[in-house]
Regions:
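Aromatic-rich peripheral "rim/lid" segments of glycoside hydrolase catalytic domains that contact
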Residues: 61-78, 82-157
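Glycoside hydrolase catalytic-domain groove-lining segments
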Residues: 1-62, 81-84
Length: 157
């Protein structure tokens, strides 16, 4: 028995994909507060907590594989830092699951939208642009952030 939460700064209006540089600080503060409040709830309930679904857009609101992910990488490091900090202190936050692995998948259409009959899937649901939150096989910096976090967790166990 454990608790889960989602964290979606863009969907919740905490950042603006057209101005990530200008809205990052405010969004980061809201994410930090949200994480702290949910860790406190988990602590009071005596339950482990997993940030089981979190994602962040690519820079400049782009969706294409290989487009810049500098703010996504910062966001992942923010989430992963909270997980590592909790693990080091014996806190309730036990893990996280990013949304979503797109791998070698690619959007079928230039507008990144699903069309009737489409079967290609890159992690983002069909009502969202494909590539919005996906981590693709060519996203080297994001993969490096994920790999470093995994290695740090392994060292702690």
């Amino acid at each position: 028995d454990y608790l889960t939460t989602h964290i979606w700064p863009l969907n919740w209006g905490w950042v603006d994909s057209a101005d990530l540089a200008g809205t990052w600080a405010g969004g980061e503060a809201k994410v930090r507060d949200y994480m702290a409040r949910h860790q406190a709830i988990a602590g009071r309930l005596g339950k482990p907590l997993v940030f089981e679904e979190f994602g962040f857009p690519r820079d400049a609101g782009l969706y294409d594989p290989g487009s810049p992910t500098s703010f996504k990488d910062r966001y992942y490091r923010l989430i992963y830092g909270a997980v590592l900090d909790s693990a080091a202190k014996g806190g309730p936050l036990m893990g996280s699951n990013f949304w979503a692995w797109g791998g070698e998948g690619r959007a079928a259409h230039p507008d990144h939208r699903f069309a009737p009959g489409d079967r290609l899937y890159v992690g983002d649901p069909m009502h969202e642009p494909q590539g919005w939150y996906s981590v693709f096989d060519v996203d080297e910096s994001t993969k490096a952030v994920i790999k470093a976090h995994s290695a740090e967790l392994a060292r702690m166990s």
